[in-house]
């Protein structure tokens, strides 16, 4: 009986007590897993008393005093409040502009309804003695078609850390991104999609995976470019790094450089000039979030090698406690240094986006928003009530990953978001959009649901937790329009039924990748069948490059690292690839982007040329070509499921970013794309 009460509580909390796997088989989530997920939501369920208390917390109340702090609405449409009422209720609406209106909340099907409001923004609704934020969004995000009607744009995707720039110290930076944007814009490109730039760990350079951030509110100073901020060349020792990045060595060199720049800033004329004033404004604008991030960075450096904050003494685990305040007061210059790093990073990104737009790009830089954050990071420490401590994000078992996946990330608590007016979600969106022309939302399904795993459990022992997707999509649309940012949702793999349609209706562009565009009749879907609303690409950072796929080297690498799937014979996979090669080549020939007999596995140049032209011929509003494919490289940036055994996130471009586009093969491929998709 108690287990059934737990299941009922879980359902009411938005936890799916059953789920279907990739084969359609149903699974029931065990009560211990449900209890762990409930506990992370602030709904303990281990005893009868806890169950009763948690059930009371979920009991819906319908009085005005129980309204949440923020309610979303769509411009031009009335909005039902979760408040009962049979008579009209007078209210005062204060628009974001300051205009005040007197409105009536009218009853509709037993609930009060806010009349339609045309103006988008964060307005205030006052009813009796209760005031809430009414976030009125446009119906859709800003789309590529809003930027350029009937668009057929093209752009590049690049791993920021891998860009090569004469002034870097072995890790790609935003000066390299600016160089690439300037060169690509001159050739007709309208966008550059970059790998995540989120803050990692200044004191722990061994943790360099860009999708496992310490905080998504701040940036990784390793990508900062002081020359973009100070307008002068900063003397650095030339980097000898080629091929693979040595993150600890390069990080040490970069932070040594940034420390020198900081000290010169404090002692020089800039401190009392416009740049000093700009730094002061930035610190004021970012407020407590920046201060706490700087405290965390300084504390972690002092606590190393005890790097995980949950292992720190109890008084240091409280970001608002006396011990942390005492530490910060005793290290004022160190706190200021970490705030300076964020200011330089922020202004570097702003400058790089400005260069992209001045180069003629209609979109410019597209940032990447990771699905979650490291539970041992800055955000988790400073805003513990925001997140699902004790749970990690992953994926249930599937054909390629029969044991499931644990990404060692955590995310926002949907209950905490709703109770707190979605402040952390909005802050994350605003940080991602501040200096971007577009954002890519990694694992966009996380807007609707996440697979959550209790820490210490296997990935298969998880559960789906539903999120307030309608609210999140409205807030995403509002911030997108306010920032003039287009939104791309990574919607690959298995997603809930209707999710693709939901994204499309919200103006979010999905992703179409060559390897997944299959057709039972012809093998591969022709370009005209790729639709007209998504973003097309040859591959992604987690998938084989065109040359690697054609040669079959991706099969060898996955087999070497045990990533083919349990019990999968590599010879079977190789034979399937032998059958797929002519299917892909024939698709190219039918579209007149390839000709002649099927190339041999090691004849990759013609195949890469054809793939790039094939993607360019699609009718989607934006085609993105990874630099790895423009260069004809075999190696992919990341092999999912591996950490140190494969050189993930370490590959460098063989030459400066802007010079890459001038090489014969790259120039030829860009010519194909620019001819098919000329800038209008």
Cite the ranges covered by each PLM segment.
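Carbohydrate-interacting/catalytic domains
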Residues: 1-194, 230-237, 473, 481-486, ...
